[in-house]
Amino acid sequence: MADTLEFNEIYQEVKGSMNDGRLRLSRQGVIFKNSKTGKVDNIQASELAEGVWRRVALGHGLKLLTKNGHVYKYDGFRESEFDKLSDFFKAHYRLELAEKDLCVKGWNWGTVRFGGQLLSFDIGEQPVFEIPLSNVSQCTTGKNEVTLEFHQNDDAEVSLMEVRFYVPPTQEDGVDPVEAFAQNVLSKADVIQATGDAICIFRELQCLTPRGRYDIRIYPTFLHLHGKTFDYKIPYTTVLRLFLLPHKDQRQMFFVISLDPPIKQGQTRYHFLILLFSKDEDISLTLNMNEEEVEKRFEGRLTKNMSGSLYEMVSRVMKALVNRKITVPGNFQGHSGAQCITCSYKASSGLLYPLERGFIYVHKPPVHIRFDEISFVNFARGTTTTRSFDFEIETKQGTQYTFSSIEREEYGKLFDFVNAKKLNIKNRGLKEGMKQSYDEYADSDEDQHDAYLERMKEEGKIREENANDSSDGSGEETDESFNPGEEDDDVAEEFDSNASASSSSGDGDSDRGEKKPAKKAKIVKDRKPRKKQVESKKGKDPNAPKRPMSAYMLWLNANREKIKSDHPGISITDLSKKAGELWKAMSKEKKEEWDRKAEDAKRDYEKAMKEYSVGNKSESSKMERSKKKKKKQEKQMKGKGEKKGAASKSSSSTKSSAKTMSESFKSKEFVSSDESSSAESKKEDSEDESGASPAQSSEDSASGSD
């Protein structure tokens, strides 16, 4: 066997970033060289305590644990390389390379185990995930929760920010499981610890974001905010800028600390720490350092004993420790003499401060916009009232900020400031126009162009012209719209007849001088009588045999009274639940007894159904025969009625034919007179009588034959 093993393209995970390198195993130990950073991990063979082989995202991985608790992980091995590594570990390190699979059940509950520098979350004996405690930057506790925050790697595309564990309470007295969990994490985590005494402490300072009162402890490398509910440790390296801003009432001061990354409270992130001070509040401050240390460290910026306004002391100490300048408002002065402008942003009102290199808005939510990231600004007239305007800022990234409800008196000062800073103004040249527009709205000018008024004037002119035309022709009655021929056609179409419109109706219409719209005749359609939909619903036959019950229902009917006696006063629903629980808990042998009873009941039911169906068939055949007989009788009666109708129709037809023949054969020279007409009528009457008698006799004979 070779004395060394070398592997290329092996990856090491560093705070979420996978760094490739070369891994070399020899008799002396394990060496990994990072290709990106050049960092070398050297693990002595005598320090190795355990080796684990497992399947990971990048193929297979090797996990090495040392005797002093350090853990090293290397990924990117092929499955075929296990035998080679296992033999090498046995031969040179006298260790068994154990195979362990990760749990992939997807459960979010399990057991947490602390081993060396690792926190392992296990389900049963299989680990789900592992957290290197050296990556933990913050550990905070809640009622039943522990939240871990992690150091970030700038090279990682996706980073794990925090993990929250729910720790259930235990019955043990004097042991808080949440606190015990947090202490296990903090003992190995790379968390900022408050070692030594604070340089100074400011008690009960009012904080607007995050809201509350906090004690601020100043340490050499970080700032500690201690409140009733939350604690924050803020390293000075995360402080970007400091602002000291006077309130508009000239009695208060804002001290703003800009942070990156922000502090977090639950899911809320605070990029700005805003403290509010009263100008009248004074303090005497003594630093917890001797004068030589103060002089050496701060080089005259601070002294051991200081006194003055509280906001001055806080800002002075922060400036010296953070080593950053404090930004104050520039030479901008508003209409009221203040260095800020009252406005609204989103749903809250606040103060906008024009600075020398940007704008800052306090306090809810705080916004800081630098001039170098502004694309352009825009002055817009207010939407609800003309006594205010909106100030819009659009950044080069496309983000838009709208500060609304700014008093119109501030417009001139703000416009001059923006112009002096050489910012791009989207609607440049509207300064004079905007001032003029306010005057016009205060007292409208006749020269102002109003599109709506112009349109109304045009409509008025058109109405006047139409009125003049109608008055000129009011004495004459015109019949241009009246067309008798067309009207006749309409009527003919509507009533489906050849009748023409009467002259009297036409005269009446012309007299009135108005043409009423013709009413359309309703076309009556012959509707067939609706057939009643007879739903043939088969009623349940009371004589039919009842369906058999299941094994559970047989058991329940037999044991219902027993359950009631065991649980007096139990409701119906609770009884059903209890019965279900008892049935589930019953052994298989006892259930088989009731299953047999259910099978017997089923067989009896099938037998009864066969007998019932045979009886039903005989009854149904009798019913069918009676129905057929009834239908035959109805048919015979219907045939008799039809014969009678035919006879009556034939008699009436002979009568009408005789009459038409007598009327049709008349000569052209025939002159009608009273006598002739009377004689003719008599003749017709006699003919009618003679024609009726034979018809009657024929009907009688027909009835006799029937």
Swiss-Prot record:
Where are stretches of biased composition, namely Low complexity?
497-507, 647-664
Annotated protein name in UniProt: FACT complex subunit SSRP1
Does the record carry Electron transport as a key word?
no
Skewed-composition ranges (Basic and acidic residues): 532-544, 587-610, 634-645
Q: Which GO terms describe its biological process?
A: DNA repair; DNA replication; regulation of chromatin organization
Q: Which PANTHER family does this chain map to?
A: FACT COMPLEX SUBUNIT SSRP1 (PTHR45849:SF1)
Q: Does the keyword DNA repair apply?
A: yes
Which family is annotated? Belongs to the SSRP1 family.
The record's function comment reads:
Component of the FACT complex, a general chromatin factor that acts to reorganize nucleosomes. The FACT complex is involved in multiple processes that require DNA as a template such as mRNA elongation, DNA replication and DNA repair. During transcription elongation the FACT complex acts as a histone chaperone that both destabilizes and restores nucleosomal structure.
Q: Tell me, how does this one assemble?
A: Component of the FACT complex, a stable heterodimer of SSRP1 and SUPT16H. Also a component of a CK2-SPT16-SSRP1 complex which forms following UV irradiation, composed of SSRP1, SUPT16H, CSNK2A1, CSNK2A2 and CSNK2B.
Locations of Basic residues compositional bias?
Answer: 517-531
Where the record puts its DNA-binding region(s)?
Answer: 545-613
The segments labelled Disordered in the record are: 458-551, 587-706
Query: What InterPro entries does its record include?
Result: HMG_box_dom, HMG_box_dom_sf, PH-like_dom_sf, RTT106/SPT16-like_middle_dom, RTT106/SSRP1_HistChap/FACT, SSRP1-like_PH1, SSRP1/POB3, SSRP1/POB3_N
Q: Where is the composition biased (Polar residues)?
A: 693-706
What GO terms fall under cellular component here? FACT complex; nucleolus
Main location, first listed in the record:
nucleus
Q: Where is the composition biased (Acidic residues)?
A: 474-496
What Gene Ontology molecular function terms does this protein carry?
DNA binding; histone binding; nucleosome binding
Where found, per UniProt? Nucleus; Chromosome; Nucleus, Nucleolus
Identify the keywords attached in UniProt to this record, alphabetized. Answer: Chromosome, DNA damage, DNA repair, DNA replication, DNA-binding, Nucleus, Transcription, Transcription regulation
